[in-house]
């Protein structure tokens, strides 16, 4: 079976990751101690993608939990899922990264990384046929961004032919935690462009907007935001965890979604999202789901898909859904909004189906789009980066850990290149494709 090893780095990564395990364990009928209490054979059919079954019949997540300070780990171990994870898989330092990317990537994190890789190796050896890794982390802090990207590059070296998917929480000015977030984010994107195969961009600002506007929560907490993220993560991984007609794994997803290796940053969405009180007043139909999932207000990254074009789209429907209806809806959406899809990739909308609906819903859909408007998100972070870097503000924290200014300039340049590539393909028509291919050949 095609197993996935899951990594969580830093406070944000661990909180989102643990919420994800909460949702997935519930869907598979596994309680807080790892015992199976479910009712359906479907729950067990592909359970070993994410869980390891011990000799005593206990199911243990293939998860490695990493942080540079023990606080978050203590909370997880004391929480409802404390007995689920393997105790050896908690790897933590004592010092913290102090929201400093350099500490996570070069000093504190580098000291801990071998210990983490040992645990990762152990998990990888316990699999039949490892398909890849998924990392949950944020790009704004120190541990998730610095040490998270360090882990990605180390795992890349050791398992070059395995897939690497990341769920990355991008910082946003409205929900800012620290002033150096733009530095940490740009340095991380620089790494992810090279080393990740698929990155699902999640954005605190967009999550807040969804909580305010759609879910009508007056004061959203981080718990609400993490809940949204975990719903999406559960949806994206549905096809990996349950049998379905389009039984995708991470590699098939990448083949369908990534037309050029650097352009692997996806916008994700979920439908139906309704406020707690008003759900009983709405009928959920396939038409409504498709409309809501393409709606800009439903995107979990603060970039407006109407400002760009879709290179590729994948939609995962769950529950009792007629596939014919889904296909018809998808075709009609593409015909009505043809200007939002690039015409030089035919059939660029894939839909898959899984019969197991999420808890409390009859049907739902998870949306993954590779849209050129994701550049807005990078532009936003890049602009904040430039404003600070121009004045060399806060740089001594990074150079003090042994970093060089050149590294900042390189990361910034790489991000600007990425933005330029997205713009280029957004504007490319069918006829320009030959010229584009010609330009890309290396000049001697």
From Swiss-Prot:
Listed PANTHER family: TUBULIN
Keywords annotated in UniProt: Cytoplasm, Cytoskeleton, GTP-binding, Microtubule, Nucleotide-binding
Impact after mutating residue 40 to T: In strain: 22000, A128 and Nine
Organism encoding this protein: Microbotryum violaceum
Protein function: Tubulin is the major constituent of microtubules, a cylinder consisting of laterally associated linear protofilaments composed of alpha- and beta-tubulin heterodimers. Microtubules grow by the addition of GTP-tubulin dimers to the microtubule end, where a stabilizing cap forms. Below the cap, tubulin dimers are in GDP-bound state, owing to GTPase activity of alpha-tubulin.
Protein's recorded name: Tubulin beta chain
Family label: Belongs to the tubulin family.
GO terms for biological process, alphabetical: microtubule-based process
Record's subunit section: Dimer of alpha and beta chains. A typical microtubule is a hollow water-filled tube with an outer diameter of 25 nm and an inner diameter of 15 nM. Alpha-beta heterodimers associate head-to-tail to form protofilaments running lengthwise along the microtubule wall with the beta-tubulin subunit facing the microtubule plus end conferring a structural polarity. Microtubules usually have 13 protofilaments but different protofilament numbers can be found in some organisms and specialized cells.
InterPro entries the record matches: Beta-tubulin_BS, Beta_tubulin, Tub_FtsZ_C, Tubulin, Tubulin/FtsZ-like_C, Tubulin/FtsZ_2-layer-sand-dom, Tubulin/FtsZ_GTPase_sf, Tubulin_C
Effect of residue 54 to A: In strain: 22000, A128 and Nine
Binding-site list for GTP: 11, 138, 142-144, 204, 226
Superkingdom of source: Eukaryota
Keyword Ribonucleoprotein: no
GO molecular function: GTP binding; GTPase activity; structural constituent of cytoskeleton
Record flagged with keyword Disulfide bond: no
GO cellular component: cytoplasm; microtubule
Phenotype upon changing residue 69 to E: In strain: 22000, A128 and Nine
Subcellular location: Cytoplasm, Cytoskeleton
